[in-house]
């Protein structure tokens, strides 16, 4: 159980670090699937929909 908790905390911290480096682009969205192509076209690796706008994670 302690190992599971440690892995869970590690994943949470890593996801927060990735989210901090997000770059917002001016593309409206309703779900994250709509952000994949605009983010790749902008030279980014991943994209997710946050508050109705695409938030992209840079390559690196």
Curated annotation (Swiss-Prot):
Signal peptide: 1-22
Cysteines paired by S-S bonds: 29-49, 35-54, 39-56
Pfam family, any one: Toxin_2
Tissues of expression: Expressed by the venom gland.
Keywords, alphabetical: Amidation, Disulfide bond, Ion channel impairing toxin, Neurotoxin, Potassium channel impairing toxin, Secreted, Signal, Toxin, Voltage-gated potassium channel impairing toxin
Location(s), subcellular: Secreted
Domain of life of the native organism: Eukaryota
GO terms under cellular component: extracellular region
Main location, first listed in the record: secreted
Annotated positions of the Lysine amide modification: 59
A Gene Ontology molecular function term of the record: toxin activity
Protein's job: Blocks voltage-gated potassium channels. At 2 uM, blocks rat Kv1.1/KCNA1 and Kv1.3/KCNA3, has a strong effect on rat Kv1.2/KCNA2 and Kv1.6/KCNA6 as well as a moderate effect on Shaker IR.
Description of its domains: Has the structural arrangement of an alpha-helix connected to a beta-sheet by disulfide bonds (CSalpha/beta).
Family: Belongs to the short scorpion toxin superfamily. Potassium channel inhibitor family. Alpha-KTx 03 subfamily.
Comment field (misc): Negative results: has no effect on rat Kv1.4/KCNA4, Kv1.5/KCNA5, Kv4.1/KCND1 or human Kv11.1/KCNH2 and Kv3.1/KCNC1. Has no effect on bovine KCa1.1. Does not inhibit the growth of Gram-positive and Gram-negative bacteria.
Record-given protein name: Potassium channel toxin alpha-KTx 3.6
């Amino acid at each position: 159980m302690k190992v599971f908790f440690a892995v869970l905390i590690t994943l949470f911290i890593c996801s927060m670090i990735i989210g901090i480096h997000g770059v917002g682009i001016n593309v409206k969205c309703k779900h994250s699937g709509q952000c994949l192509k605009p983010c790749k076209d902008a030279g980014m690796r991943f994209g997710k929909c946050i508050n109705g706008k695409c938030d992209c994670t840079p390559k690196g």
